[in-house]
């Protein structure tokens, strides 16, 4: 697919462009309204097309609890008895959707207690309508999102079966939430993985106490604009971090329900690095 079309979709989903304007511009790029409509299925998430770990997988067990006051979500753990490190899975700007639920199950299959937090809990929970979810995410203040993250991390350190260590992995909006959690200096936060997430202000970097793994896509100009300043601050302050750039990949390359932007090669490599990193620091 033409990169200009992918970039337009990114601006639409992250920059406040309304759907009418998006469709008009898409029609211009595609050549006609009819052609534009044929492109939409590849641009928008199709949850029926990808599910790596089914809900009934016998290796895991899932529930939808409130792990702390106002902290609801999707909790998945290995079926086998034992103690495990815990990971907060932070969703994109469309809420706790089927894709993020699948990612949460994948994390549990790797040997973690995984909690896909629903950051829209206070607004009634993630709706089925993704456009509505995106609007609701836009109403969340940074302080509200951070408070949710910190409460979730604190609860996960004490949840039944936890080894007492908790980290976080986030995607897109959730990647930015991981970076925000890192600069909060929360003592319960032991490791973070941010997939193409907005960077924290350089002035806040000295507060970071946990190691970070940062995944970026080479075609993601919007997010990549902040890398240089953030990395310079990480280096200057002697922070433990790994940064990987995935050549030829787009923002959201991990999302296997999005045909236009998913990159299996980048996603598989980033996932293996993510699991190894979290086991190193939380295991």
Residue ranges and their predicted role:
Residues 214-216:
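Short beta-strand/loop motif that positions the catalytic acidic residue
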Residues 84-92:
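Short beta-strand element of the alpha/beta-hydrolase
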Residues 120-143, 254-258:
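Cap/lid segment of the alpha/beta-hydrolase catalytic domain
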Residues 16-24, 33-52:
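N-terminal twin-arginine translocation
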Residues 135-158:
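Alpha/beta-hydrolase active-site loop
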Residues 151-208:
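Primarily recognizes the serine-hydrolase "nucleophile elbow" in alpha/beta-hydrolase
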Residues 49-80:
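N-terminal cap/lid segment of alpha/beta-hydrolase-fold proteins
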Residues 1-21:
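N-terminal secretory signal peptides
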